[in-house]
Amino acid sequence: MSSTRHTPDIDAHTISISTAVENVQKGDQLKIEVLDGKTIVAVKNVNPAAAEVITLKNEKLWSPSSPFLYNLKITLLRNGKTVDAITSYFAMRKISMGPDAAGIQRMLLNNKFVFQYGPLDQGWWPDGLYTAPTEEAMVYDIDQLKKMGFNMIRKHIKVEPARYYNYCDINGMLVWQDMPSGDLGNKWETRPGVLDRATEKERSTESEGYYRKEWNAIMNTLYNFPSIVVWVPFNEAWGQFKTVEITEWTMKKDPSRLINSASGGNFFTTGHMIDLHNYPHPAMPRPDVFGSKLLLVLGEFGGLGLPIIGHTWQEKDNWGYQSFKNADDLFDKYATYTKRLEEFIRLGLSAAVYTHTTDVEGEINGFMTYDRKVIKVAVDKLKTVNDRLYLVPAP
């Protein structure tokens, strides 16, 4: 067995499981076992050539507050004997959209509105750039963000190792996954780009081919991680091309997730959401223009900067979108931003992304310093104001 593919359907109370089996022989069977911990809750013997749909009774749903994972064991039987066996896991969770009582589209988790809020996370490290020094260091960031009261991470222009997403699955952290950009050059005609005022990059045949190949590979490789709920094909017009075609292909390839076709501008009428970037203060797309058809999200804002002497990448020329001299002033400003987000949620905002988890080289606008030695604002203070966002009801 070389791979599996798991697709939950909480409305039908089923999990669809397909298994790629090489060198199948006549009479081979797959024994699929679904376990709650070590207790078998469903078992089925099936033909290796077909996907199998298994019904679960009284299934437990996965969410940030209750990240329950079912264990999965698949055994290849030949003449009644085991010739191969693998273990994996899956979650029963659904990400979708639907109108609230006011007709505004809301992002739904397991058919209920859950405001999604988290940092822009580039996953940079001073000693390894895109490579964390250890697994413990990598998951440290996720742990701290959870303690700060965030329920989502936008993984920005980077794909992490599988262990990263596995940890998000286990700990109940939602993930928006970006496609790493290439071919800089095209711009939107107005900032932040709006519908019907967009430009696209004319990429070479080779460049376009690499994009399609790599985006396909990313989606295939990460498909089984339930924490991933949004795919982001393009960001701020960077290398953006054939937006409608790429977005609709992405939606067709994975209808189980939402698609943020163009985060931050260069919008086309495709995908599930319209995504505004605004610095430093929060803003939102107009609900009266877009809200009845698209999810309204704030894909980037904030960037409040605080340099910590002895923990900056460079001594001079550090920057934030707005800089402060002490943590108290920074937090006070941040708290005003979360209060504004509460107002936006009532108007129809479904998600927001703050810039960002850590300082990144010359950018000193992280919650933590680049070396992770200093958390700039007390975790409990951040959690207090962040938690309020999840209590704001939709109409």
Residue ranges and their predicted role:
Residues 142-144, 152-380, 385:
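Substrate-binding/catalytic cleft of secreted carbohydrate-active enzymes
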